């Protein structure tokens, strides 16, 4: 896009918001990513946007200035990692059910290791269903699988994540979201 419109200063600022709490997530972001063209990055405009973020959110918030490609990669890495975490937890839940293990105790013991984190662990999830749905994870997992294959990388891990999700969430409710309008409700 930047090549098509060289006189425009385009920046890419991926969002890291959840559908159910987008307003809260926006106000409480952990970092801002600013992607721009080339090296050095569009420094003047990136710096202006950085200053705007710091004025609004304070100096303690991390701001990473990078290329378009790296900014997009960061966004996909986040969503694909969280989708992987959901699929992993669903698979562990299936095992716990089979061996009659106490799922809640198992999860409590699991998260005492601080490296695990406390998000994307619920089985069933926040929507009362197994696996992941919504408008981001299914789309982003499929996009990364297809992109990897396009550039000659076999996407075994993400393909397995996708297969597990199709198994535990056979209704594929994300397909119902096409053309959906976003509201603040």
Question: How would you name each of these model-derived features?
Answer:
Residues 1-13, 18-119, 147-154, 164:
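Internal alpha-helical scaffold of NAD(P)-dependent oxidoreductase catalytic cores
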């Amino acid at each position: 896009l930047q090549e098509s419109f060289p006189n425009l200063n385009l920046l890419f600022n991926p969002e890291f918001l959840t559908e159910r709490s987008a307003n809260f997530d926006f106000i409480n972001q952990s970092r801002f990513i600013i992607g721009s063209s080339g090296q050095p990055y569009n420094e003047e405009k990136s710096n202006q946007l950085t200053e705007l973020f710091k004025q609004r959110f304070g100096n303690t918030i991390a701001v990473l200035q990078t290329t378009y490609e790296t900014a997009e990669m960061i966004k996909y890495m986040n969503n694909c990692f969280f989708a992987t975490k959901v699929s992993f937890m669903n698979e562990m839940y299936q095992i716990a059910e089979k061996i009659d293990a106490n799922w809640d105790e198992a999860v409590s013991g699991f998260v005492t290791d601080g490296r695990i984190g406390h998000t994307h662990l619920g089985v069933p999830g926040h929507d009362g269903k197994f696996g992941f749905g919504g408008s981001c994870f299914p789309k982003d997992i499929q996009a990364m699988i297809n992109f990897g294959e396009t550039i000659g990388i076999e996407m075994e891990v993400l393909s397995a994540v996708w297969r597990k999700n199709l198994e535990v969430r056979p209704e594929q409710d994300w397909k119902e979201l096409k053309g959906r309008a976003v509201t603040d409700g």
